[in-house]
Curated annotation (Swiss-Prot):
Comp. bias (Low complexity): 145-167
PROSITE patterns (alphabetical): RIBOSOMAL_L22
Xref: Gene3D superfamilies: Ribosomal protein L22/L17 (3.90.470.10)
Protein's name in the database: Large ribosomal subunit protein uL22
Designated gene of the protein: rplV
Database matches in InterPro entries: Ribosomal_uL22 (IPR001063), Ribosomal_uL22_bac/chlpt-type (IPR005727), Ribosomal_uL22_bac/org-type (IPR047867), Ribosomal_uL22_CS (IPR018260), Ribosomal_uL22_sf (IPR036394)
GO CC terms: cytosolic large ribosomal subunit
Amino acid sequence: MTTATTNPSTYPNAMAVARYVGISASKARRVIDLVRGKSVEEALDILRWAPQQASEPVAKVIASAAANAQNNEGLDPSTLVVATIHADEGPTAKRIRPRAQGRAFRIRKRTSHITVIVESRPSREGRRGGAGESAGGARARRAQGSKAAAAKKAPASSSTKAATTTEASEEAKGGSQ
């Protein structure tokens, strides 16, 4: 079911493959799209509560890839991310369903091959050390600048609006001309 390997990548990784899984590839892809790019812990939590039947075999393959990373590659399980995950079509078994008046319909029992590659990436908190705070600081400074500019413009426009409103109300009352 599983194979440990290292693909050429910038991060250390491990791989697991489940072949001939008794679910169609299109149904497996519905579940796979939920967890692509997530951390392994988050992906397993999502799959634990997903109602689709394909969530169980996909969760098994992700757990197997995480175990391969920890045991074979010596990677920290808390830093693992589902980097690549895909489902390919496997062989299709054909069966016959008898129908009325001597007819028969074909049943296609589809299988799939599910491949998962997990990478050990530094946590988001660790990556934000210097560059993230400067970007956040720049964003805060831009926001303050735009707030200050809006505050300078706001009183002028509100006083103009107030004068226009006063003139309109005076005319409506039939006041000074």
